[in-house]
Amino acid sequence: MNRRDLLRSCAAGIPLTIVSGARAPQMYWAGTPQRIVEAMLDLARVTAGDVVYDLGSGDGRIPIIAAQKYGARGVGVEIQPQLVRRSRQTARDGAVDDRVTFVEGDLFKADISAATVVTLWLNDRMNARLEPKLKTELKPGSRVVSHQFRIGQWVPAQTSHVDDVDLFLWVVPEHAG
């Protein structure tokens, strides 16, 4: 990937893994705007009974807003330790640390079986890699919302367009895995 494409991807907020001769990949992150976060959670029809998992949770704003605005429980999975620390502090500052947990780890290895809602802002390739995990680990009726990117060949149940951003909703069917 050339420098211009990298900068364009980062400016667009696309989390991007770059392997450039280093042993560990570099992860880039940009936060989802509040209006988009709320639109994603509204699209998933989040309620106080939900457990919202955000895969690649960055600064934790999606699980935190899910707890603050909707009364849901939230779990953020993030590989960057400094973002996990920041998320935990923000949850404490927002008085939702009793309902929100942040896990430092690889989203492909995380146990997501307790989720009723999963949110994503990854990219096409990562979403496609996640598709089998989502379909096998999530219970039927669980909702998945992606900011900007589709999930493989999985057909969305609903789409929304907010501030020039496409949002996609999928509902896990019976016998998905």
Language model feature labels by segment:
Residues M1-T17:
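N-terminal secretory signal peptides and thylakoid transit peptides that target proteins
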Residues R73-E78:
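Conserved SAM-binding motif I beta-strand of class I
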Residues G60:
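Glycine-rich SAM-binding Motif I of class I
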Residues G49-G56:
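Conserved class I S-adenosyl-L-methionine
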Residues T32-A48:
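Conserved alpha-helix/loop element of class I SAM-dependent methyltransferases that forms part
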Residues M126-G177:
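C-terminal substrate-binding/active-site "lid" region of AdoMet-derived donor-dependent transferases
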Residues R88-A110:
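S-adenosyl-L-methionine
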